[in-house]
Regions:
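Post-HEXXH active-site segment of zinc metalloproteases
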Residues: 300-303, 313-322, 330-361, 497-501, ...
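Short, flexible loop/turn elements at secondary-structure junctions
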Residues: 267, 271, 289-291, 312-314, ...
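Catalytic zinc-binding patch centered on the HExxH motif and its immediate surroundings
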Residues: 286-305
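Long, C-terminal catalytic modules of enzymes
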Residues: 358, 378-392, 401-412
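Generic recognition of stable, solvent-exposed alpha-helical segments in well-folded globular domains
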Residues: 255-258, 262, 303, 318-322, ...
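Type-3 copper protein
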Residues: 1-286, 302, 309-311, 342, ...
Length: 624
């Protein structure tokens, strides 16, 4: 059998990435040529995945109600008259997510239980793509489509919400009839009576729920963002389940519109390079539920280049910096589809922006994304005033150092390819230009505390001293040995899978700068509580400048709850503020050793004494 999709005009030729792209992208510049190459590779990649889905589906679901060849035949017809529409369907982020998930299912013998739809229905998303292409191009035809949770999806357009809930059982089927131009509306045949789709699919009418497109940029030539609340694959790996969530309400859409316009204005005014990156690479925003202050939720996926999940933050600055961050993830995902930057086994390492150990690829992604964050705050802090400016200075100081430290790790790592080393070297040169930029004393001090805090908490959570060496160290202490002659203890990475969110003291530092009255209210509410929730009380004492009282609070807490991981780092910070150098250094630089030794020699005792003893022992070379 000949392949019915062999003639789609997206050319599967050789893609070449010039060295200048590495240089430009590392510096945050997305030239028109680089953008064209990113999207050309994505189209080729997804077309290959469509071929694979179609070939496998013929063998795995040959008798299904939605044969893949009928969808590909319709896509071919669309491609002959409007190849640009087929190109946009291939570039649609949901296409990549669906293709990867469906290929995994087609290559697996496992039968997934409900509510996961049967394989034929998941393959049927290909029919939804073809139907959307027919509607957009005016190609007449008839095609059957799957129904998931009363919804019929038309990617890049929206969805139809059927008026009646289908009976329990397998997903239902409907038929879409697309007429020739000028001969009437498109009809969705549901078995009893047809539903007419509106002539203008940009506007809601009846059961039709269109996607929202928002002109975020003051430049009319920049494409709008699509607020994606309809596609079943918008949540990346979630699949077509629980898709019947309500569409965005009018007030919700207006909230996104207002903040996106404000973010677009400030990006074009003060961050033109970042604005250009957004315009070239970020197309789809998937709204998430509102998140707490200073914890805007956002995510990207390597098979959904051009898309980002994010919650709507409070300010235009926070939305702008989140968009910059996610756009950089999309750029790097697109670049990694062109050439390898990392090869071989990837050790798990510390990343300041994550609570869990990350592979080398995660460090590269984070360093690139947070370089954009640091550069944003580097510029934006000078346009802000008073508390907002102090917070921006803090963010710049934190992420400037975090990125520089991570890039230093990457440059010494053996896993970078030649292209990867070129990219990281250029990114390092860009970040080095920020080193001498001054930051006011108060936010600079808080940034230093934040960085020390993040690393110390990570060490307590994910490093474990070699047990035999820790036992030998405990024996030396119990025997009254001089700590200077005690055995060295190396620590090994032992990830705690439950620890993925960085410690909450970062939120308190940001609150101290942005809204100190709110921090005072939290302090009064916390009172003098002791127990599992008491780290908040001790943390508030530390952040409000009562370091001596914070030391006592952490001591009390750890005596009763040594499992309070962040309290070990908090105690180290409080001791440093009071001038106790040896113990504080041990708690901030080797907290996992202090904790292990304390458990072996002085449970219930004074953790400061244990930390002081560890601080005078020889330190083993890092083998994290």
């Amino acid at each position: 059998m000949t392949e019915p999709h062999a003639d789609i005009r997206t050319v599967l030729g050789r893609h070449r990435t010039p060295a200048s792209d590495l240089d430009d992208l590392a510096a945050g510049r997305v030239t028109p040529g680089a953008a064209r190459r990113i999207w050309a590779v994505e189209r080729s990649r997804r077309l290959l995945m469509l071929r694979a889905v179609t070939d496998l589906a013929r063998r795995r679901v040959p008798a299904g109600p939605l044969p893949p060849d009928s969808a590909m035949d319709l896509l071919l017809r669309v491609d002959r008259v409007r190849p640009d529409i087929v190109a946009e369907l291939l570039e649609h982020p949901g296409t990549g997510v669906w293709a990867v998930r469906t290929l995994e299912r087609l290559n697996s013998a496992e039968r997934l239980p409900a509510p996961v739809p049967p394989l034929w229905a998941e393959v049927g998303y290909l029919h939804c793509l073809a139907a959307a292409g027919a509607l957009r191009s005016g190609i007449g035809g008839t095609i059957r489509l799957p129904v998931h949770d009363t919804l019929v999806t038309l990617p890049t357009l929206g969805r139809v919400r059927l008026p009646r809930t289908p009976p329990p059982g397998p997903p239902a089927l409907v038929t879409l009839r697309v007429p020739a131009p000028g001969t009437g509306p498109a009809l969705l045949l549901t078995g009893d009576r047809p539903l007419a789709l509106p002539a203008d699919l940009r506007r809601p009418r009846g059961p039709w729920e269109p996607l929202h497109r928002i002109a975020w940029s003051p430049r009319p030539q920049d494409p709008p963002f699509t607020l994606e609340d309809a596609d079943p694959y918008r949540g990346f790996r979630a699949g077509p389940t629980a898709t019947a969530a309500p569409a965005l309400t009018g007030p919700e859409t207006r909230g996104w519109h207002l903040l996106l316009r404000a973010a677009g204005d400030l990006l074009h005014t003060r961050h033109p390079r970042a604005a250009k990156m957004l315009a070239e690479t970020l197309r789809v925003l998937v709204p998430l539920p509102t998140a707490p202050r200073f914890r805007t939720a956002s995510a990207s996926y390597n098979e959904a280049v051009g898309s980002a999940l994010l919650s709507l933050p409070r300010t235009a600055q926070d939305l702008a910096v989140t968009l910059v961050h996610e756009a950089r993830h999309s750029v790097l995902n697109g670049l990694l589809h062109q050439l390898a930057l990392i090869e071989g086994e990837e050790p798990l390492l510390y990343a300041p922006w994550r609570g869990d150990p990350r592979p080398l690829s995660g460090l590269l992604h984070g360093a690139y994304a947070f370089a954009g964050v640091a550069d944003f705050w580097r510029v934006e802090r000078h346009a802000l005033r008073e508390r907002a400016a102090e917070l921006a200075h803090f963010e710049f100081a934190v992420w400037r150092t975090a990125v520089s430290e991570t890039l230093a790790v990457l440059l010494t790592a053996p896993g970078l390819t030649d292209a990867g080393r070129l990219f990281v070297t250029r990114l390092t040169a860009e970040a080095a230009t920020w080193d001498q930029e001054p930051v006011p004393a108060r936010p600079a001090a808080l940034a230093r505390a934040e960085l020390a805090d993040l690393r110390a908490v990570w060490r307590v959570r994910h490093l474990r001293p070699d047990p035999d060496l820790a036992d030998a160290l405990a024996a030396a202490r119990r025997g009254g040995a001089d700590p200077r002659t005690a055995p060295t203890v190396r620590s090994l990475t032992r990830p705690d899978p439950g620890a993925v969110v960085p410690d909450p003291r970062g939120e308190l530092r940001r609150l101290l700068l942005a809204d100190p009255d709110a921090l005072d209210r939290q302090a009064r509410a916390a009172g003098s509580a002791v127990g599992p929730g008491a780290p908040v009380a001790a943390d508030l004492l530390l952040l409000r400048g009562a370091a001596a009282e914070a030391v006592d609070a952490y001591r009390t807490l750890l005596a009763e709850h040594p499992e309070a991981v962040s309290a070990w780092a908090g105690l180290g910070l409080a001791l440093r503020e009071t001038g106790v150098r040896t113990a504080s250094a041990a708690l901030l630089e080797r907290p996992e050793v202090v904790r292990a030794l304390h458990a072996r020699t002085a449970p219930g005792g004074d953790p400061v004494e244990t930390a002081d003893w560890v601080g005078r022992t020889p330190r083993a070379p890092e083998q994290v």
